[in-house]
């Protein structure tokens, strides 16, 4: 149990069977009445953000999360198979459990998997990854002056918008949080 007075940004708590991460908190002590803590909570499972108010000193169940470094080894019948880098145990996850990050997974890629009570809550990909462009429209000389973008399909099947000068076979860096092009990989 944790007191609402001890909330900090990043603290994880459990309310009604769901795990929430404290994004913002504010201790309020009004002139009349008792003090309270106003919080903004983000669901670890689906990313929903809610505002909730707690009485000062109210006890809440703290959620202790386990983080494991796993390596993606292969895909078998729709499941992604990961290997723990320390114990060498295999973990199978569906694309639903991985979420939108499944479109960036390559064999050999290391990810952080967050567990709560032996259930997968979240798969954290590296923020920036390097992938090869497998399909895109050819760039025409002189196109770069307009600063436009075009769609490109990467080796994992993910689609991102890239500048017009990018061609098939180039290695590019992609931000996995918002599917944006970061630059060429040298």
Curated annotation (Swiss-Prot):
Subcellular localization(s) per the UniProt record: Cytoplasm
Coiled-coil region list: none
Role description: Involved in peptide bond synthesis. Stimulates efficient translation and peptide-bond synthesis on native or reconstituted 70S ribosomes in vitro. Probably functions indirectly by altering the affinity of the ribosome for aminoacyl-tRNA, thus increasing their reactivity as acceptors for peptidyl transferase.
Protein's pathway: Protein biosynthesis; polypeptide chain elongation
Protein keywords: Cytoplasm, Elongation factor, Protein biosynthesis
The family this protein is said to belong to: Belongs to the elongation factor P family.
GO cellular component: cytoplasm
Classification via CDD domains: S1_EF-P_repeat_1, S1_EF-P_repeat_2
Matches recorded under PROSITE patterns: EFP
Protein name as catalogued: Elongation factor P
